[in-house]
């Protein structure tokens, strides 16, 4: 378990649901904002807080971000300025030191920080289909049941996506 100090999260302690959305945000753009806000609405979690988690370096990419961490955070802050119930949690940047960070570790740390909150992980369909290659995918699903958003370039229907997810072994039919 990661014993590094946990970065505070600028979300009210009474927030009951946190939708976690991670990425390199290199640089952040409207495609990192609009679909996430829409996913909150479509999921019916209107009062949930959107927690953006900039990655130090994605374990799924061969190189680190082009933009420096501080610049990515500042640009993300500007992109989210008009979005209600949205926060940036820099825990991965502060503990990563430029190394790859893993979603499971981030979710465990967030659970320690907010033990009473319901956690949901927002991921694109492309990432959902690759979840079986992530570190400890079954625990990820247990800690933060995913919300899956369709993205450009991923041609699928709900039925095809459900079947493909089940075939990966990271998901069960009930999830």
Please provide the spans of the model-predicted regions.
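Nucleotidyltransferase catalytic core that binds NTPs
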Residues: 1-175
């Amino acid at each position: 378990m990661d014993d590094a100090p946990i970065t505070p999260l600028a979300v009210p302690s009474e927030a009951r649901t946190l939708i976690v959305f991670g990425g390199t945000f290199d640089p952040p753009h409207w495609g990192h904002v609009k679909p996430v806000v829409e996913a909150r609405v479509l999921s019916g979690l209107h009062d949930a807080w959107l927690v953006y988690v900039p990655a130090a370096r994605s374990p799924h990419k061969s190189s680190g971000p082009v933009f420096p961490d501080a610049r990515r955070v500042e640009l993300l802050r500007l992109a989210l300025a008009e979005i209600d119930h949205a926060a940036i949690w820099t825990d991965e940047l502060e503990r990563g030191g430029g190394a790859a960070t893993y979603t499971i570790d981030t979710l465990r740390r967030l659970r320690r920080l907010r033990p009473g909150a319901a956690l949901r992980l927002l991921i694109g369909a492309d990432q959902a289909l690759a979840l079986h290659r992530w570190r400890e995918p079954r625990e990820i699903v247990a800690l933060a049941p995913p919300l899956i958003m369709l993205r450009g370039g991923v041609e699928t229907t709900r039925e095809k996506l459900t079947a493909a997810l089940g075939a990966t072994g990271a998901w069960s039919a009930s999830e």
